[in-house]
Amino acid sequence: MAKLPVEKMRELERRFGEIEARMSAGPSADVYVKLASEYSELQPVVSKIRAYEKATAELADIAAMLADRATDKDMRDLAEMEKPEVEEKIEALEQEIQILLLPKDAADEKSAILEIRAGTGGSEAALFAGDLFRMYERYAASKGWRVEVLSASEGEAGGYKEIIATVSGRGVFSRLKFESGVHRVQRVPETEASGRIHTSAATVAVLPEAEEIDIDVRPEDIRVDTMRSSGAGGQHVNTTDSAVRITHIPTGIVVTSSEKSQHQNRAKAMQVLRSRLYDMERQRADSERSADRRSQVGSGDRSERIRTYNFPQGRLTDHRINLTLYKLDRMMEGEIDDVVDALLADYQASQLALLGERQN
C-alpha cells in the first residue's frame, strides 16, 4: 500500500481550520459561498484524517500500556484484545484517505452527454438501445438528475437506432463514465416463434458535457446547414427549415438536431459538438498516459465489449472486472449502483497500486 502523504494531510487540516474560522467571522455573502464550497469539498477527507489521527494515538497508548511492566493482567488482556481492532481500523482509514486524495478527474463533477446507438442485430438491437436508454433514465431519476433528449432516430419496431441526451446534475459523469463501450444482449425476441435466443448489441458513449469555457469553437471552423425537420415516416413537422446540421471542418465531426425551434437546435447541436471536441482532447491526453493504465475499467475504448445482458438467465456480466449479478430485471429498472460502485472501486484500486509503485 502507498504511504500516506503526511505533509499534505497536515496542510489540508490547517486549511480546513482556517476556513472554519473565516466562516465563523461573518464574511460577505459572496465570500461565504466560496468558503462553504471549499469546506464541503475538504470535510470528507479531513474527517477521515482526524479519525486516523485519533486511532493512531489510541494504538500508541495501547503499545505503551503493553510495554509497561506495571500494567496489571486485566488491563494487559484488554489492551491485547483491542490492539487488532484498532490496527484494522487504521488500515481501513489509510485506504479511505488514499482514495480521497487520489487526483480528481476534472470532468467528474460535470453533467454528461449520453449517446446510445443500435449495433448488430437489426430491430432487436434498436429495441435493446431503447431498453438501455430507459435503464439510464430510471437511474438518473433515482439520483435526482434531469434527462433531456437532444435527438432521436426511432427503430422500425420500436426502440432507437440512435438517441442522444443530456443528463444534468452534479457528479453525473463520475457515475456514468465507465458505461462507454459495447453492451451485448442475449434474449428471445418477441417476434421469434421458435424461441431461439438472439444476440445483438448497442454502443454507449458517455461524454462530459463541455461548456464554452472548456472548449473554444471558432466560428470559421464550423459550417451550419439548415433543413426541414422530419417526423414519423418522413412527414414534415412544419414548413420552416428548422433542423440544424453543424459540421466541424477541422475534425469532420457532424452533429444534427431536429426539434421545432431552429435557435434551440443550433444551441443543442453546439452543446454536443463542444462535448465531442472536449472528449477528443481528453482521450488524446489519456492515450499519452496509457502506459500508466492498470485497469480495463478506465480505458474508455468504445469498441470494447464491456457487458452482457443475458435475459433467459437473468444475468448481467461486466467483462472488465469479471462481475456477474443475477438481478437483471431490477438493473434494467435503473438499479445499477452495484455495478457502478464495483467499477469505481476497481478503478480506484488500480490507481492506488500505481501510486504505490511510483513510491517504491
Swiss-Prot record:
The keyword Lipid biosynthesis does not apply. GO terms for cellular component: cytoplasm. GO terms for molecular function: translation release factor activity, codon specific. The modification N5-methylglutamine is found at residue 235. Coiled coil: none annotated. Residues 281-311 are annotated as: Disordered. Methylated by PrmC. Methylation increases the termination efficiency of RF1. Peptide chain release factor 1 directs the termination of translation in response to the peptide chain termination codons UAG and UAA. Belongs to the prokaryotic/mitochondrial release factor family. This is Peptide chain release factor 1. It comes from Rhizobium meliloti (strain 1021).
